[in-house]
Amino acid sequence: MSRSVFSTLRPVIGQKTTLAPFAFSLRHASSSSSPFSTPTEPTSFHTQPSHSTPTGPLPLTWPSYLSLRRQRRLWSTLTSVPTTFLGLFLGGGYFASLEADPSQLIFGVEPMFVYGGATLGCMALGYLIGPSVGATLFSLTHPSIARGNPAPLEVMDREFYHRIRKNRADPRFQSVQNIVPDFYGEKIVSLSTYRRWLRDQAVYKRKAMHGVPGEDL
């Protein structure tokens, strides 16, 4: 009787032993991670999908992107010059054509000073809109990287600022004598300047550790 029961249970035991390696392989496959995953990424980046790193390959190489970024910034700087003078000439020409009666004050101030201040305001407005005009002209002259959904340049901008935000020092510990160097990475125009920026951030972190006693950095 016991022999017959043992012969009946033996196939079941054999089936369990054959399923064990398969279950182990499934467990091993589920625990393995993709080479493109970033499990150590902070939680704050997962809560903001618009600023997350792309899963696929980047549309541009980093040297090419940094070179284009430098050109775009140069365009923004150069266009600020004509827009500043344009605002000055337009504002000065308009307010110079107005009749100014010294006996009629504007908010208790003589019209000459009010018109002069308004002219300077037009000049400042032209200076402020210069970078926007330069960025627009740069996009029009580089349609292959500035157009698309999303545009290649926009993808690289997001990836660049993601790396800047991830590697820059914590600004909460800055002081007048120890300011965070290049907080937005505006001076980065090449890979060498990016490495220098990383070194500057590391130096700042060391200064913050020794300059803020009692803080667990």
Swiss-Prot record:
Pfam families membership = Pam17 (PF08566)
| Name of the protein this chain belongs to | Presequence translocated-associated motor subunit PAM17, mitochondrial
Keyword entries, A-Z: Membrane, Mitochondrion, Mitochondrion inner membrane, Protein transport, Transit peptide, Translocation, Transmembrane, Transmembrane helix, Transport
Record keyword Membrane present: yes
One GO BP: protein import into mitochondrial matrix
Q: Where is the signal peptide, in residue numbers?
A: none
The portions of this protein that span the membrane are: 78-98, 126-146
| Membrane topology annotation | Multi-pass membrane protein
**Quaternary structure?**
Component of the PAM complex, at least composed of mtHsp70 (SSC1), MGE1, TIM44, PAM16, PAM17 and PAM18.
What does the sequence similarity comment in the record state about its family? Belongs to the PAM17 family.
Feature: compositional bias, Polar residues: 46-55
Q: Which domain of life is it from?
A: Eukaryota
UniProt key word Ion transport: no
What InterPro entries does the record tag this protein with? Pam17 (IPR013875)
Disulfide pattern: none
The protein's location, in the record's own words, is: Mitochondrion inner membrane
Q: Where is the composition biased (Low complexity)?
A: 33-45
Main localization (coarse): mitochondrion
Gene Ontology cellular component terms for the protein in this record: PAM complex, Tim23 associated import motor
Task: Give the residue range annotated as the organelle targeting sequence.
Answer: 1-28
Q: What does this protein do?
A: Component of the PAM complex, a complex required for the translocation of transit peptide-containing proteins from the inner membrane into the mitochondrial matrix in an ATP-dependent manner.
* Region named Disordered: 33-56
